[in-house]
Regions:
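Non-catalytic terminal accessory/regulatory regions of metabolic enzymes
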Residues: 18-103
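Active-site segments that bind and position negatively charged phosphate/pyrophosphate groups
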Residues: 1-17
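Catalytic beta/alpha-barrel core
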Residues: 148, 163-175, 185-198, 209-220, ...
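Hydrophobic faces of well-ordered beta-strands that scaffold small-molecule active sites
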Residues: 101-107, 129-133, 167-170, 185-189, ...
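Catalytic alpha/beta core domains of metabolic enzymes, predominantly
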Residues: 91, 206-305
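Glycine-rich, proline-tolerant flexible connector loops at the mouths of alpha/beta enzymes
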Residues: 132-150, 307-317
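Active-site mouth loops of central-metabolism enzymes
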Residues: 100-118, 141-147, 166-170, 190-191, ...
Length: 347
C-alpha cells in the first residue's frame, strides 16, 4: 500500500475537493482504490487493492500531491501514518473520540419497554448521550434468551425519540446489520464476530458507525486488521472496544487488558473505549475497572445497567443498579478531567 499527501491549494486554505477527486480517478484507473482522509492541515489518500507493492513514484508528479509514501504495516487505513491526528466519530448527534468522555449505557438485553425506559431515564439524567441495549443476543447456550429481535429495536428507537439518546446495538448477521441500520445509530460487532470477515465487509458498506469489540483471544494485530476490513470497504467511522480477554484467571469472567488502550493509540487514529461490564463479569468490579479505563486514556465506556439486576434475563451479575450507575458517572468524569489536565500540563 501507499499513502499520498496532498498539499493545500493556494487561496483555498485546504486541499481542493476537485484535486482529491482527480487523484482518486488516477488511482482507480490503475485498478486500485483510493480512500481520502481529510485532516486538520492536509488530506491523505490511502491506496488499497494492490496484490503486490505499490510504487509511490507513479503518483509523485500528480497535481496537488506533496509526497508519496510506501506503507509497510499490514494495515493502512487505520494507521497513524495515514492520519496522525485522532479521528472523532459522529454517532447520531454526538461524538466519540472528542474532548468529552463518551458514556454508552443501558441493559445487556432489551426485555420490555418498562425496563428499557426506566434505564433510559437515568442514562439521560446522567448526561450520557448514548444508549446500549441488545435486541440480538449471541449466547453460549442455545436455550438462553436470544433477544427480542426487531421488536426490541423498535423499543430502542422509541428511546431515541423520547430521550434524545443515540442507540448503539449489536448485529450478528447481514440481516441484523440492515435492521440496526434502519433503527439504530451505531452498529456493534461483538467479540465472537470480530473475525467474521464477510460480516466485517458487509458492515464496511453501511453508512452507520461501527463499534468493533476485540475478540476474546485476539492479538493487537488481529484487532487492527479486523478494523481495516471495515474501512477497506469505505466505512471510516469505526470505534474500537476492549471487552476483556480469556486467560487462566477464574476470579473474573474475562481479564480486562487495559494495556491495549495505549498500544492501540500509538498505532491508530481510531478512538477506543472499554467495556468493564463484560471485562469483569462482576458488579463489584465494574466501577474500579471503569475508573482504571478512563485513567489509562480510553475515549469512553460502555456500561450495563438494569433496574433490577437480580431479575435480568441476561448477564445480571455484571449489571449496575441505577444508583450505582449514577455514582460511576460522577467518579469517571472527575478522573477524565484530571487526565485531560495532566496531559495539558505535560505538553
Amino acid at each position: 500500500g501507499a499513502i499520498l499527501m496532498l498539499q493545500p491549494a493556494l487561496n483555498y486554505g485546504c486541499v481542493h475537493p476537485a484535486e482529491v477527486d482527480r487523484v482518486i480517478e488516477v488511482i482507480a484507473a490503475l485498478g486500485l482504490r483510493g480512500h481520502a482522509m481529510p485532516g486538520e492541515n492536509r488530506t491523505a489518500i490511502g491506496i488499497t487493492g494492490n496484490k503486490g507493492a505499490v510504487d509511490p513514484a507513479h503518483f509523485e508528479n500528480l497535481p496537488g500531491v506533496a509526497d508519496a509514501i510506501r506503507v509497510t504495516k499490514p494495515y493502512k487505513l487505520i494507521s497513524k501514518e495515514l492520519r496522525p491526528e485522532k479521528s472523532v466519530v459522529k454517532v447520531g448527534n454526538a461524538f466519540i473520540g472528542g474532548t468529552e468522555l463518551a458514556i454508552i449505557a443501558g441493559p445487556c438485553a432489551v426485555e420490555n419497554s418498562d425496563q428499557v425506559f426506566r434505564v433510559a431515564e437515568q442514562v439521560s439524567k446522567s448526561g450520557a448521550k448514548f444508549f446500549r441495549g441488545g435486541a440480538f443476543k449471541p449466547r453460549t447456550s442455545p436455550y438462553a434468551f436470544q433477544g427480542m429481535g426487531e421488536d426490541g429495536l423498535k423499543i430502542l428507537a422509541d428511546v431515541r425519540d423520547q430521550f434524545g439518546l443515540n442507540i448503539v446495538t449489536e448485529a450478528m448477521d447481514e440481516r441484523g446489520i440492515d435492521l440496526v441500520e434502519k433503527y439504530g445509530d451505531c452498529i456493534q460487532i461483538g467479540a465472537r464476530n470480530m473475525q467474521n470477515f464477510s460480516l466485517l465487509k458487509y458492515a464496511g458498506q453501511t453508512r452507520k458507525p461501527i463499534l468493533l469489540k476485540r475478540g476474546m483471544s485476539a492479538t493487537l494485530e488481529e484487532f487492527m486488521l479486523a478494523a481495516e476490513y471495515i474501512m477497506a470497504e469505505g466505512n471510516y467511522d469505526v470505534i474500537l472496544c476492549e471487552r476483556g480477554i480469556r486467560t487462566f484467571a477464574t476470579h473474573a469472567r474475562n481479564t480486562m487488558d487495559l494495556s491495549i488502550v495505549p498500544a492501540v493509540q500509538r498505532l491508530t487514529h481510531l478512538p477506543i473505549i472499554v467495556d468493564p461490564s463484560h471485562g469483569t463479569g462482576h458488579n463489584y468490579m465494574v466501577n474500579p475497572l471503569a475508573r482504571a479505563g478512563v485513567a489509562v486514556g480510553a475515549d469512553g465506556l460502555i456500561i450495563e445497567v438494569h433496574p433490577c439486576p437480580e431479575k435480568a434475563l441476561c448477564d445480571g451479575a455484571q449489571a449496575l443498579t441505577l444508583t450505582q450507575y449514577a455514582e460511576l458517572v460522577d467518579q469517571v468524569r472527575k478522573i477524565y478531567e484530571l487526565v485531560a489536565m495532566s496531559e495539558m500540563a505535560f505538553t
